[in-house]
Amino acid sequence: GGMIANAISKPPGSRECGKGGSCGVPNLIASAVSSRGSVDNVNAIISGLRNSGFAQSDVAYWAYTGTGTMEGKEPAKDLRTIAALFQEHIHLVALKKSNINSVKDLKGKRVSLDEPGSGTYVDAKLILESNGLSTSDVKAEALKGKAATDALRNGKVDAIFVVAGFPTGAIVELASAVDVKLVPIDGAGAKALTSKYGFFSQSPIPSGTYEGVDEVNTVAVGAQWFTSAKEDNELIYQITKALWNKESRKLMDVGHAKGKTITPESALSGVGVPLH
């Protein structure tokens, strides 16, 4: 978020684009703020609390259509897409010494599903269901980020779900401190999941992404950037133009491991909510 906020910002008095200054939108100062995740971000955009935000493609589509996990809620018809950014892989992490080797092995175990307002919680719930389990079949914990990895490291939980572009810092840190494994999300369960929900795709996390962890088959969703239909057309156009500027490309290439995968060629990949 901070990387993209920097790319689209151009504060008053800053240097010219191409001469050491930002190639962002003139006089725009964008700031990245933390949130509880995809559901929180979508709600904040629709309520006008935030001008834009990142969300998982599945969560945004369900919010826009009032279907899936948002069944019974008023469709978020003002939600609009700016661009698809990168893939976020579902990491199911357990200690290497554990006997958890598949999703079905989670039955009866202490599992962090993340906070109920997050996209991770939604995905974890669907992954459990596609493998014949429900959230009531596990001892669910609502831990996020470092609280989740610390709990796994200290034996307070048996497994954690994390949805993030790899490598994600919290798991890099965890894997350097204790022997962990990524539990596969594959086979019939993954096939059922990707067949029912088109936003999921089967995609591996390569060997060596995390210390001592072999390649594992898992599933992924798209991380996309959203705004409201009420935002000014010209402003969103200029923001989009700044995002794809060649100077912004340099920032993204070095700013995050996933930065290089944010490209104009994939900007419409998996988009299920109308563009602004």
Segments (PLM) and residue ranges:
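Bilobed "Venus flytrap"/periplasmic-binding protein-like clamshell domains
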Residues: 1-20, 28, 84-154, 249, ...
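Pocket-flanking alpha-helical
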Residues: 18-73, 146-151, 157, 166-175, ...
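A structural signal for short loop-to-beta-strand junctions that line the ligand-binding cleft
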Residues: 72-88, 208-217
